[in-house]
Amino acid sequence: MGHMDTRESSTRTREIEEFTNLHFIHPVGARLTPLLARLQVSPNAVSLSGMACGMLAGWAYYRYQDVRYACLGFLLMVVWHILDGVDGQLARLTNRQSEFGKIIDGIADNVTFVSVYLGLGLALAPVHGPWVWALLALAGTAHSMQAATYELQRQE
């Protein structure tokens, strides 16, 4: 599978992809995937690296009052987003797909989302009150539903 094949497989569902995915996230991932394959990085290592970025983003968002941390959180989430696509592309490119890898990917995604919402909640609730937790729970529920719907549409 060549460079173009990696890009095509990542954009096979264009109608459900966002502009940033199509024009930034997937193209960067399509360039990174063959490099990681040559370096013999495992898809699960990519998933876990993405999860580490997500957890660090949650910590950075907890400190969002300092604009440097807010920017760091954003940058870490962009890296997570790229790695979240690369792990599957790498698994397909190197023929290392597995059910265990899918589970690791799902856990990594959920740990990332919980980390971000938790970081924001811990930062905002002392200032704005406990209603922040209800709002974040609602946002997390909506996010989970959107992610599940996206995955179902992507697999069709």
For the regions a protein language model found, what residue spans apply to each?
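Acidic (Asp/Glu-rich) catalytic motifs at the cytosolic membrane interface
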Residues: 69-128, 147-154
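Lipid-exposed faces of alpha-helical membrane segments in multi-pass integral membrane proteins
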Residues: 49-56, 72-79, 111, 118, ...
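Topogenic membrane-insertion module of multi-pass membrane proteins
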Residues: 1-74, 78
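A feature for the membrane-embedded catalytic helix bundles of lipid/isoprenoid biosynthetic enzymes
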Residues: 2-33, 110-156
